[in-house]
């Protein structure tokens, strides 16, 4: 930290930080109806939007390396923000492999098939069954069934995790029919279990949920449903239980046994990790395991470094990320979020690097332990803001990154009143960040990673719990000690940008060079200057 001394006293100069506030799930939609953002009390954000440079940027589809019209998500959004370029996402990589019929060329799957042919074990296929494209895609499961048939694996059990969060809340029947068609077309496979993602895909160490999914997969004494999968869904809906919360249900006697193989086809790690830990780690202590079958496991992507599993699609390495540039120039940075979004501002934003960079400090604020976040719309936002204000005013961090989970996590519940409260909470917290950053002479850049809370009801009248393809806002509040040289007060934010432009913008604000690998462009330009041609960086 720079310092100067005078006489016997020593004075440390305080850094005026650049603060990036990511409002998770805060998309832009003009219509007020079913829009928890436009209909909530947001005096701070409204005032900033009208008084400071602002724009809208793309956070879905090709702008973040996804297929056209594919909604963005937190993992992809933070990866793109940190990379400063469009990255070909796992959904695209895996889909291209499936469509080309190349799953059988994947080394991890080749090895698994060879071992199962020798052991005569059952192949279990487990994952989220929908076309949401956030954690998985049903086409990948269909591809796995055809791969298994071609590989001579005739004993195949399919374990479906129902969605209702990234898809309509009662849409599982459609996907169930698709899987039944794929089973018939491939000639292999049996529906073995159903389980809502609430139980199977927890990421907050709520082990009382994970154990329910674990037991339906491993317990030989679990009762088998006497009705069809379709009947299970119908009964669930009649009881007011939607897809996300579907009770774990065994449909056949095909549970996990010693010598079996498992492919977990979720490609997003954060919500697949806990269940796979329970299935594979010898020293797992999240809950007592009455049954611990010895399995040969392959996951589609790397969920964490120390899992004893094969990985079908290893990560592509990334360099010259935002955090690396800041670190390599000897500057300190601070990343903070509550439990639900902590991996996003750390692991994902750093391109899949788990260890902090030199000079990077991370602070986790626990999320409230409630069943669903409509019961606590404020979540931990006030505590999170307090910790961030302390970091800003410490005067040691050049870059401060904070994520507010409320718009996304409460938006996912589909409860309008709770979402409005969540939005107003975040608005109030932005006011505190603004005051703190201003006192330090720093600059505040506000954006979001994808849309969600701006649409709370679908055209069918059902609650909308998924993300959207809407653009997201960017607002720049320059600080007195961070004024950009050569612009005066004549700054505007250009149109036609995407999330890949956030890192180059931050580097310009920090007066740091943009690496050649960052194909994104700063959003900052002088008023009335020509706007760069609206082009999206090409995936790498």
UniProtKB/Swiss-Prot annotation:
Cofactor note: Binds 2 manganese ions per subunit.
Molecular functions per Gene Ontology: manganese ion binding; phosphoglycerate mutase activity
CDD domains: iPGM
Active site feature: 74
Record's keyword terms, sorted: Glycolysis, Isomerase, Manganese, Metal-binding
Pfam families: iPGM_N, Metalloenzyme
Residues binding Mn(2+) 2: 24, 74, 449-450
GO BP terms: glucose catabolic process; glycolytic process
Cofactor(s) listed in the protein's UniProt record: Mn(2+)
Catalytic EC class: isomerase
Annotated binding of substrate, by residue: 135, 165-166, 197, 203, 268-271, 341
Enzyme Commission number: 5.4.2.12
Protein origin, superkingdom: Bacteria
Record GO cellular component, one term: cytosol
Catalytic activity: (2R)-2-phosphoglycerate = (2R)-3-phosphoglycerate
UniProt: Mn(2+) 1 binding residues: 408, 412, 467
Pathway membership: Carbohydrate degradation; glycolysis; pyruvate from D-glyceraldehyde 3-phosphate: step 3/5
Record-stated family: Belongs to the BPG-independent phosphoglycerate mutase family.
Quaternary context: Monomer.
Role this protein plays: Catalyzes the interconversion of 2-phosphoglycerate and 3-phosphoglycerate.
Protein name, entry field: 2,3-bisphosphoglycerate-independent phosphoglycerate mutase
Gene source species: Prochlorococcus marinus (strain MIT 9313)
